[in-house]
Amino acid sequence: DRQCCSGLDALLLGQALISAGQADVVIAGGVESYSRRPYRAHRNPDGSQTTYDQASFTPWPNRDPNMAKAANDLAHYSGIDRQQQDSWAIDSHAKALASRMHLASEICQIDIGLPQHDAYSRPLSARLCTRAKAIYGSVTHANTAVAADAAAFCVLTAASPATKRAVQLLGGISIGGDPCLPGLAPIAAIEQVLDRYQLNTAKLTHIEIMEAFAVQALASIQGAGLDPDLVNRHGGALARGHPIAASGAILAVRLFHDLRSTGGIGLAAIAAAGGLGTAVLLRTE
């Protein structure tokens, strides 16, 4: 169960199939219908049931924290306060609102009476953030991404398409880290994937970091030495929601469109419960 990493991991599995000669074209991505999530319960020996919302992600109960608690622990570990988290959330919403027209080409329009854009982003203010209810410590409803429904897919091909600025999936890294601080996992994944392809952060032109929590993005920027001005330039999950299985693929779709437009080298990275992390590099040929 790759949880939040699954959308990016699907791309790497598709790339592996093509590299092994098992396929010429692969459609890879993810779908999440959080609004239709099943009712989950453990059946006890006496026949009774105990409901639960978060599944177990490690065999050690004392190393399997609630994700909000893990985010708050990450904030303490990284020295990131609530004001910094709120500021990142405010910027995410502002960038998403400013980019609605820019992102229109990324969204497949489904005529079922719903908005043809990400409808959640809004003018978020410091005052609203201050009033937001705390979930755990410095982690609040304002600096945490809401659960969402979405789907995102990429088409991977063995041969480069005969188009201007074809985008190449260089490759990626999936790693395991401390399950108590899963937000640190993308840092190691970023460092390893850059090392594998003999690149450094100065070579990156576009960066998409999953922001299930504001502190997650801030910790990745801080830990991996990323330029914050390059990260989530059109807003992120804080402004649009976190459709778990689709979130990683959404990062890749964003990079694809930006790289097709301007060229360069793009990085996408995401963390998942259990201490998982995946980082992927794309570039224009």
Predicted regions and their residues:
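Active-site nucleophile and cofactor-binding loops and adjacent substrate-binding regions
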Residues: D1-S6, P61-R63, N143-A148, E208-M210, ...
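Active-site-proximal alpha-helical scaffold in enzymes
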Residues: D1-V31, A75-A104, A150, C154-S160, ...
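Flexible glycine-/small-residue-enriched beta->alpha junction loops
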Residues: S19, V25-D73
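Short acidic, glycine/serine/threonine-rich loops at helix termini
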Residues: R36-H42, C180-L181, P243, G277-R283
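N-terminal extracellular/periplasmic Venus flytrap/periplasmic-binding protein-like
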Residues: Q84-A166, G223, P228-L230
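Active-site pocket-lining segment
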Residues: C108, L170-A239
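Condensing-enzyme catalytic core mediating Claisen C-C bond formation in acyl metabolism
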Residues: A126-A188, Q192-R196, V253, R260-I265, ...
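Internal helix-turn-beta structural module
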Residues: R196, L218-G223, D227-N232, A237-L281
